[in-house]
């Protein structure tokens, strides 16, 4: 009996382009999953003899002496498999990495997943409250932490009952390991072991690779369960199918934080899987980024809108050449067509620069432009293969016409199956037909059949590529029970023609309170990550505008904000519209 079968081999290192070609049609047919695995996944020892195993794949963009070939990575990952098991983590337990980007970060990801554990990356900007929430929602049992970030993790982990011996120091740059802690190198000292194997489709679909936090609109961040099936499907579509027409060897540079969904599995697994070199930046800085593109002759460039804005507005764009780039893409948030055109001027003639759209819940891109298709209209492209989509109106009724805006709902092999242990959110997000309701408003053009983002049903604020949920900020401000009676947070555009935003709080003081704007901002600064700061300011009101049912009328606040920005008004009495 024939069966469809799809494999995510988290170790991926051993698959040379030649061997990997057998996996490109991973939704093809086979008589037996076990035979399929045997065919495409030869033993690690056999693959280690392949000549392409010695090629350097991972490169430290800040220290050229640090590189990793497949052979080196293979050994490190097999050692980590043994180390994770020796450390006492059980199969299915979740481990977290708290670190800035590094070539060894991906090895830890691969080693942990290969050992049958589940990855979860935390934002290095987290404060203690955010770290504790992350630990609770992902059920992290084990940490690998860079020394500079240890204090927040120790306090958060201790308060959530994680013992000290489950925290390892990620001293990849020779940093000193604090007394009483073990270096992550301890995990490399227990020999080498092979990875966990999955030999049936249903287990593949229900076994997680990662638990990734995603901002919600009704509370704190939720945790999306990315499965092996999701990861394999995404790699097959993005790293192979969408680039099938590319005739050169891709060379990339990654400025993105490695906890982000855009790097899982695109940065952690796909480079070893394809064999294409990638340069990893520890932290983003504009000049080293541009210099790296020129020096390493980067061909495939992925950026986010704030980065595009920084590039086109900086004189550094004239100092460094981007002419090596042969295709570029922008994602995470919408990019206005004007900025897209300005960025294209910096590239060589004929180079494609397009946009994509996706979510944490879709393992990344859900729409894109397959190379060499071009666009200058601000579209986010076409749906990736094997994806079902529907549009619904505000009443949840299907929209069947082109050029009509509606909430886009998707299902397919890259869509995660659930939020981790959050039945309420699952019921609100997935319908009875299995469609994920994204909260994003799109339409499909009748002439070109291209998709366009026009609005967000969700009230997420996009700050430097990160998602900020207004309810999280509102909840933090309402902790000042003696000073704040009511609050609403919205996002203001950083520039008139930009989609980057700044959080602004509208605050109602309690009687007798004299809390100032600085005092309100301090409530956020002291407890939440820096990108969640109220850079859009604070406006004091007598009353927050609400509908008869109590819903905050954020549309009204945005209208006021538009007027205030023009008139430089800092206070306004709230009038509730009829």
Curated annotation (Swiss-Prot):
Its EC number is 6.2.1.-. The keyword DNA repair does not apply. One of its GO terms (molecular function) is CoA-ligase activity. It holds the Pfam family AMP-binding. This is Acyl-CoA synthetase ACTT5. Disulfide bonds: none annotated. AMP binds at residues 211-222. Disruption phenotype: Leads to drastic reduction of ACT-toxin production and disease severity after inoculation on detached leaves. Belongs to the ATP-dependent AMP-binding enzyme family. Keywords: ATP-binding, Ligase, Nucleotide-binding, Virulence. GO terms for biological process: secondary metabolic process. Acyl-CoA synthetase; part of the gene clusters that mediate the biosynthesis of the host-selective toxins (HSTs) ACT-toxins responsible for brown spot of tangerine disease by the tangerine pathotype which affects tangerines and mandarins. ACT-toxins consist of three moieties, 9,10-epoxy-8-hydroxy-9-methyl-decatrienoic acid (EDA), valine and a polyketide. ACT-toxin I is toxic to both citrus and pear; toxin II the 5''-deoxy derivative of ACT-toxin I, is highly toxic to pear and slightly toxic to citrus. CDD domains: Firefly_Luc_like (cd05911). InterPro entries: AMP-bd_C, AMP-bd_C_sf, AMP-dep_synth/lig_dom, ANL_N_sf. Residues 472-551 are annotated as: AMP-binding. Gene clusters encoding host-selective toxins (HSTs) are localized on conditionally dispensable chromosomes (CDCs), also called supernumerary chromosomes, where they are present in multiple copies. The CDCs are not essential for saprophytic growth but controls host-selective pathogenicity. Although conventional disruption could not be accomplished due to the high number of the copies identified in the genome, the high sequence identity among these copies is likely an advantage for RNA silencing, because it allows knockdown of all copies of this gene simultaneously. Pathway: Mycotoxin biosynthesis. It is an enzyme of class 6 (ligase). The keyword Zinc-finger does not apply.
